[in-house]
Structures are given as C-alpha cells and as structure tokens.
C-alpha cells in the first residue's frame, strides 16, 4: 500500500489482539535468518495447557530428493495466565507446525494469573552459501515433541521444538565442475518463506522502489549420491539472450494455495493463521539468460512481516549442489510483485525445475474487519491460483466498562549492535467500546516476571508515545493497521500526563474519556547478544468503579543456521518437574522447575558433549548428538529440594531418571531423560492459653482458648496461611519448607496479652503477639501465646451550657441534653456513640485500659466554649475533641461546654436627597424612624427607632432569617430599591429580608426623600345671573365653609372663603381628595359644569385628584332666591304679576333635600307664562314658575308650570297632595298638569279653580323660601331648586351639585334630561317639581287659614 502521507510504498500490517501471530526478524548475521515467535498475553483467560500440532515436511516432488536447511526454534514461554477480576476465555489457540523450511508455533502457558495467547512464529529457513563452498549441508525437518494436555493419566511432555539436521558430506570438486555442454539438471526443490508481520513497514520514504533482495534462497541438495550423468543432459553452450524478456508463457507451474487454520479452531484470523503456497515450476529450455518470470499476489496477501528488513528473505534461487545462482529476485512491494531473472544457468542446463513452498499471510490492511469469502490469489507466470476464507477477528479484551486491544506492529532487532540494537512498535486500542470512563489510565510495561530475558524497555530517553483520538462511530482496523490521518493527534494534550516509572513502565492519564484512543509506543530494544531473547510488553486499562482490562504481547527470537558436519545427529532432552506427591511419576498439575543444569557426557569417553539449563517450564534440549550412549547428569537443584524416587512405573518418558542416568541415542531423538524433585514439608505451631495468674507461663490448671486467629507470614511479611485455635487452644501450620517464619496472634476479644518469655522453658512461656519461628529440617511446635481476661472501666462526664462563656462549669449552668458523643480508639475507629441525658450527662462503659478519643458534636445553635480555662479538669471544658486515658480505673473528667452565640442586625435610614437609591456622602440619616424585626413566620420580635444619625440595631440575635420593616417617616417617600451594586449602600426598601450566619449583618438600610406638597382651592362667587359661570362683575362670597376629605373620607382640613370668596388648602400630597362647599343660607346652588371652562361651578361636592401639581380650579357659585311672592292675592291677577313669581318660590323649599333631582331645573320657561305657558316645554319642569316673575301675572301665570307632568311626582308625594294644589289654573295649560297623576291625584279637585287663587297663591313667597315649610317634607323638593334657572326657557338641564373632576380638573357632564338613559333623572326632576308645587299650594292654604 502507499504511505498515506509521503505516497511512498509501504506495507502496514496490524497484529490483532487475542490471536496468534507469525513474525520473522532479520538480524545482521551472515548466513543466518532470525525467526520470531510471538504471543499475545491476555489477562483474565481460563487455565488451559499449551497444545501443539505436529506435522512433517514432505518433498514437493518425489522424483526430486531435497532436504530442508537446518533450523532451530526456541519457543517463547506462553503459559496461560490467571488474573483475578478478569473474564475467562477458553478459546485459546496453539499451533506448532513444521513444514519444509517453515515452522509456525504458538502456545499458552501460565504466567502469574495472566493468560497468554501465543502468536504464531513464522519460520523462514534461509542459508547463505559462500561462493567458494562446493557443498551445502543437508537437513530435514522432523516433528518435535511438544508440551500437550495430559488426559487419562498421561504425563505432560515438555514444551520442546527443535529441528533434526542431516548434513551430507561435501561432494568432490569433480562433481562441481562446470560442463561446457548444456546438461540436464536434477529436479530442484526450492523452498522460500516470505515472512509476514502485522506491522506498518516503510519500504522507501521517497518512492515506490523495488527492493532487491540479497538473502539467497538455497535449493535443497539431493539426499541421494550425486551423479552428474543421471537425469541431467548437458546442453551445448549457447550465447545468452541479448534482450531481457518476460517468459511467463514459458513457465509451467503446478500450484496449490491453502488456507492453514494453524490452531485448528475453525476460525481464520490474519496474522495468526496463514496461507501455504506450494508450486512445482518447470522452465522451458527456450528461456535464456536475462529472461524473467513473475510472481504476482493479490492485495489481500502479504509476504513479509513485522521487520521491514525481512523483505530480503525473498532471495535468489540457487542450486544447492554447487551454490550456483539460477535466478535473482527483485521484490516490488508497492505492486505486490516478485520478479525472478534467470542467470546463464539456464543457458547451460536443460529441463530446469524448481519447487517453492512459501508461507504467506493475509493482509490486515485490506481486511480491516471480519468478512466472509475473502479472496486470496497468487499468479506464477501466467497461472493464477485462488482460494477464499471467512475472516473472523477475535473480540477485544473487555472487563466491565474497560476495553483494550494491542499488538506489536513493527520490530527490527539487531543482535549484538550496541549503537543500534533495533526498535519495536506497539499499537494499543484504548476504549474501543466507546464507554464513558472516569479517571481512565493506561499502563504500558515492558516487564513480566516470567520473562527475565525480556529485551523490551520503556523510559523517557528511548520511548516515543503518540496518542490519537478516534472519532465517534469510527471503525478501527481489527488488524491494528491504523490510518492516523483519519484520527486526531492529541499527543500534545497528554505530554504532561505521561509518567514513566520503574520496571520499564509508563502511565498515561486520560482522565474522563468517552471515546476511543489509539496509542502508538515506539521504543528501542535493549542491547543483547542473545540469539534467543524474548520481548514482552503488557498493557492495562483501568478506570474508577470498573475492573481493569489487561493483556500483553510477546515475541520470541530464534536463529536458523545452515551447515553441519556430515553425519546424522539427534537430540537428548525431557523435563525437570516438582513431584509434589513424591511418587516419582509426572502427573497432571505438577509443574516444571527451571534453572536446573543438565550436562551430557559421552558415556564411552566421558567427554562432555552438551549442556543446557531448564527453561521456566522445566524443559531442556541438547541437540547435535550422533548415535551412542550418553550419561545425563542434573545439578544446581533449587535450594531445599530433594530428589524423588527413580524408575517408578513402566513409562520411561514419565518416570524420573534420578540425578544421573545413561540413555541411548539410536537413529532418533531420545527425550526420556527427566528428573523429579520435591520440597520436604514441616509443621509449625503450639498453643494459646488463658493465663489466669498472669505470670506468662502455662500452668497445669490453665486451659486453652479456642477460636484465636493465628497468622503465618514469610520473612518479607507476606501472609502465607491463617488458622484458628481448636477447642483445646491448639493450632498448627502444615506443609512448610525450611525457613524463617513470622507468627502473629490476634488478641481474643475481652483478653489482654500476658507477659512475654517469663520463664526459661520456651515450650511453656508466652511468645507474645508476634514471634519468629525457624524450621530447619524438623517441625517447630514451640510457638505459643498467653492471654488473661481484660478488666473493664467507664469513661464520661458532662456537657453543659456555658452561659457566661468562661469555659468552666458554674453551679447555675445547666446540662445540654441530646448531644452526640463519639468514642474512638487510637486508630480513629468508632467504638461507641451515645447522647447526653436530660441533665447533660453521658458515659461509655466496658472499656479496657488504653487511650481513647472522645468527640462531642456541637449542638445546633451553639458554639464551643473556650478549652482548659481552669486548673480543675473536672469542671473545665475539654473542647469538641479530646483524648481520655483509662489506666486501671474509670475516667469521669471528659466534659465539654457550649454557649449560644448571638449577633447584631441593622444599619441605617437616610434621606436620599437626590432620590437615586444610594447613600451619598452628603446625605444624612433620618432619626426617629420606626423599624420592626420579625421572624420567618411574621411574628414581631423587636421594634426600635433610628437614632439621631439614622442608625438602628437589633442585638442578641441567633443565626436565622429575619424580616425587617421600615415605617415611612411623616413627610417622606421611600426611595428606589437596590439601585446600585453595593448592598451596604443601596436601599433595601420598606420590607426586606436579612440573614444572620455566624456573623453580624449590618447591611439592611432604607432611604427616603421628602414628599413634595401641593395646594388646592379657588373661588366661591355670587352667580347673579344664574348662568353657572363666573362673570367679571360677579363677586366672591365670603365665609363659605369648605371642607377637604382624604380618599378614606376622613376630614383633613376645613376653611372659609375670604372676603373675596377665595379659599385654599396647602401642604397636600399627591392623591385623591373630596371638596365639600357648604351652601350659604338663603342662597341657591347655581348650575354646575355648564361649560368646559374652569370658570363654571363645580357643585357642592367635588372629587379631585392631585398628581404632582397644584389645583386651583375648584370653585362654586350661588344665587339669591326670589321672594316677592306677593301673592297679592287674589290673583288678581291683575297684574297678575306678581304672583308670578309667586310660584317661584316653588322651589325654594326644595332644597331640602336637594335631592335630587336636580333637575328641577328647568323651570325654564318660566314664566312665560304667558301662559302660553305652555312651557310645555316639556320639561318644564322646572316648575318653571320660574318666577320669572313678573309678570304676567296674568295670572294665567299659570305658570302652570305645566311642568307638571313629570308626574313622576315622585316622592314627595306624601305630601301634600293637598292637591288643592289645584294649581289652579287648571287652567290652562292645558295639559298642564296633566301630570296628574302623579300623585297628586288630587288634582282633580281643585280645579275649583276659582283658582283665582291666583293670588294668594303666589304666596309666593315666602314660602319659597325656603321651604321653611318645606315641611313638605322636604322631600321632594329636592330639586325644587331647580328652578334656578329661571331661565326659562332654555331648558338646559340642571346639573347636580355633586360632580366629579377628572385629572385635568374638568367637570364630567351629566346626561341631558332628554337623553333616553336619563329617564330616572327626568322622573326625579318632575317629581321634585310636583312636590314643590304641592308644597307651595299647601303652604298658601295654611297662610290663608292663618289670616
């Protein structure tokens, strides 16, 4: 694939976690190709012994004899790990195969509770023959014994894998001479492994260059004696072609491409399983030197692995018989193409045949996720071979919320190179499940105790860590092939959160994370000269409230070597194990013992021929031994071990050979030389007893104490075992090795340890709570401990209210009940909790000698008093936390005092002259303002007044929330509230809330400014023309009483008009008021609000509103009533006149009650009486009479008042009726009266009319007046008045005396009498007229009688 950044040819191969991987690492050793075996360590997998599959290499063409190069592989220890808190995974994969030049292996072994999943190691056998050598050693691959799971009482075999090598003697020079004539060559079997790694490998940083490979692939030599004249035809030497050409059409291949399920679990996983490519290639004799053929593979295939340098393993093809190169290789990784160019070898030999056997791999780059029917194909020449596989990646390691995956993605190892030991890269997926993690941390550690030869390292000097954040929903490549351009580089954000620690570790603090991250660790190998080192790197993701998820990756390196000495050789080996049941036979569950030295001697010559040290799993192998008898000796056994019995049973591969035994190698490996060892075990213990006399020695009558816990620890303090004493006080620890131990006795409840080692008999005295026991080849039953029952005591005293705060209990101060008191031991552990009783007393009982901590909980609303203020500890306060000591008696001195703290609340009331709501420097306080304090339930607690500076304060207040209310001082108005940002300077208004919390609150203030005052008044005048308007010639009326009422109807001022009729009320606030004019005696209210002019009369009662300005528009007018009356009786009218008026009066009376009716009015017309009288006018009303007087008496006058009508009559009624009323006139008017009705009923009568009346009648007069008479029950009349208006005719409706002024002081007009909505007014008006008329007639009659 192309480098996504530099567009150069690279191959990125990802190693998938939890799977097997095959690797090869090229080292700088001439003639040596390094082989890598990889493992993936997964925490939390179930126990499963490593298994191995066996396979043998077969020749590709039976007609051709071939042998593999010598290869050697050391397996990485891959035992399963059992890790607490991690999940189990029983799907462990293991695979060991050996085919031709390739060996793939893996296995699982236990490493301290961790589970290991092996990654398959790809073995590519490459040997380099020097040009001057005439022969290459012959080698074959043999199946290796491998460690397998034992069932049906079968024993475990050690985990071994080794190649058996056969080396041919070198042929003579004669046999290697070149022949001039072209000869027929033997069939050649070519085997080459291209190694795949799951790493990102940069081929060339600048271009997609073709990599020429200089690691040769050696054609295996025939195992049969070489005969040049057999199956070889020497061709005449012909000139080589001058032009290179593609001869794919001249290449015939018979190819198979097989998907190999390495661990036979029916799941195909890239970098774990692989493809086996086998092909027999025949070269047409037409091919010339310089011609070439190609091998093309699909994008889903990769032919080299973790190490970019391993591309060189695709090497030249050589004839192993003479080392001559047949074709040179050129590998174009960018285009998945291998080009082989023929040398002149094909010019000199006919019938050239080649056989290849490649292990090639699946490219995780092009298979990012699990997928079915993935195609893989390889084209050799023009023949394409295909196969498909269902790819199934394993899941990540998940433990609760934590999830993780990791893989080595590139390794380059340079053994023995101090300056450049090589490097490796590990790719880690953090939280691929995208859970929300709290306090997430990743630990990367190149260390594991089971891999002491680990060449990995993590430290700040050599390690570079890159961190990428994965977008939400992004699918990560399950083969760990990461395209970082699609991720966000957040490395700089975490540079300060990377901590390097001991044991080659680094911790990255991700904090709270809810997305996935990719961490790439690029670091150097440690320098090593070992040809078989291991690389192990562990990763652990932890977060709060979730179990950690851990796994690891491991790689093993081994060397393959070509060559040997010309005879067949074999191996001796087997196993050293711990025979726990001492029966001398290997059994299931018994483990191998490492670091035991095994030495092999030639039994005939006593010459040392080999030596090895057992691996961690106890296995060993000594190779290159020809047939013969050998003595195998074991030495350097672990300290404390002894040898188990030898030759127990009938299976020599399972029994123990002892420290020294003789075995025979005869045509095959002998893997039966093993050794069983065991650790002898001993007991340690004794007795725990009750030392009733406290002398520290076991007496005969003193008995054991059962149920006492005894703990056994090693020299480092690690707990080994815990037991409890039996019914007799005895205890025993069994199965112990020689060594020093620590024994700890737990003091039984209610007991105290007795004195230690009081006597000289170590088996009888007490060893105390902690002692040391030594086992040295024998049991140790001398460690005992004595205890006696502990006496009990009391501790306590008193909690009181220290009212005077002096820290001492006074006789008048009382206890506080219900206070919580807690008793703790010296370690701060709570022992007891109690509360004080009603008197403040408390007590803790049943206490042993010792030091105790007593803590008093401060009761609500109280504060602790001062501590230790007196010399008498029995009465002073010990504070809220103190220490009390009990030493063989009660301690009743631990007490504590509290008092209720009080605080102040208040501030300031000021005159806010500029009305801005904020206290300014030049604004002064207002004294005498009442301030009220209430509790949260609105209950009044206190009331104060501000001092001369405007300050106020409420004292002795407890913590709490309070309400403060300010009373507005007379003549002031509250200013604006909270106008500024300074709570101590702005106004809190009339009502505010104050909180006291352990401190005074002096921030509650209120501002007021002086209220503006206004005036109200105007004029009362004599309305001589009765038109309801002030005329320039009309003068004021003196001494008219004017009363001012507030909105509540309360009298707030009374005055009289001055000599000019003027009146005035001052110092009034804005608001609603009522002005009442008292009608002067003998005067009649003039018409009201007759115009829109401020000069008209407002009536006897006026509502007015003052809003920020004076109001001098409230006036009223009166006129004098006509008396005349004359009556002159007789109506005579003659002149009539007179009378006229007469009537007038009418009204007069009225007054009375005013009432009404206002309207009266009208009279209008008056007079006119001219009888026309008609006055009709409807309304008439008014009683017209209108005095108008005069005139016309003509009696007619009738004044008829027509008016009448009204009927309404109203009221009055009662009255009179006199009816008489007759109103004479009958007269006329026609209709007049009509009215009738109304009441008066009468009427009729009348008429008499005589009427005449006239006169009299008139009587005018007087009566009028007022009514005096009024009697008439006043009533009515009401209106009477009305008349007013004489006026006659005009009959503008009369306005009532009481009017309402709007905000502009304009009188609101009443409806006209002709309005349909004012029927009641008309009724009242006419009723008033009739009442007035009745009253007049009645009065006239009376006068006549008086006369």
Swiss-Prot record:
Region (Disordered): 55-185, 857-883, 972-992, 1078-1323
LPXTG sorting signal, short sequence motif: residues: 1310-1314
Residues carrying Pentaglycyl murein peptidoglycan amidated threonine: 1313
Entry superkingdom: Bacteria
Intervals of motif YSIRK-G/S signaling motif: 23-34
Any single Pfam family the record assigns to this protein: Big_8
Domain CNA-B: 569-680, 681-791, 792-901, 902-1012, 1013-1123
Membrane topology: Peptidoglycan-anchor
GO cellular component, as recorded: extracellular region
Acidic residues biased stretches: 1091-1101, 1118-1286
Gene Ontology terms describing biological process: cell adhesion
Ranges annotated as biased composition (Polar residues): 62-71, 94-109, 146-155, 163-173, 860-869, 972-981
Subcellular location: Secreted, Cell wall
Keyword Cytoplasm (UniProt): no
Keywords linked to the UniProt accession: Calcium, Cell wall, Peptidoglycan-anchor, Repeat, Secreted, Signal
Signal peptide: 1-35
Annotated spans, Ligand binding A region: 36-568
Keyword rRNA-binding: no
Propeptide: 1314-1347
Function: Cell surface-associated calcium-binding protein which plays an important role in adhesion and pathogenesis. Mediates interactions with components of the extracellular matrix such as host DSG1 to promote bacterial adhesion to host cells. Contributes to the resistance to killing by innate immune components such as neutrophils present in blood and thus attenuates bacterial clearance.
Subunit structure as annotated in this protein's UniProt entry: Interacts with host DSG1; this interaction increases S.aureus adherence to keratinocytes.
Family label: Belongs to the serine-aspartate repeat-containing protein (SDr) family.
UniProt name for this protein: Serine-aspartate repeat-containing protein D
Annotated gene: sdrD
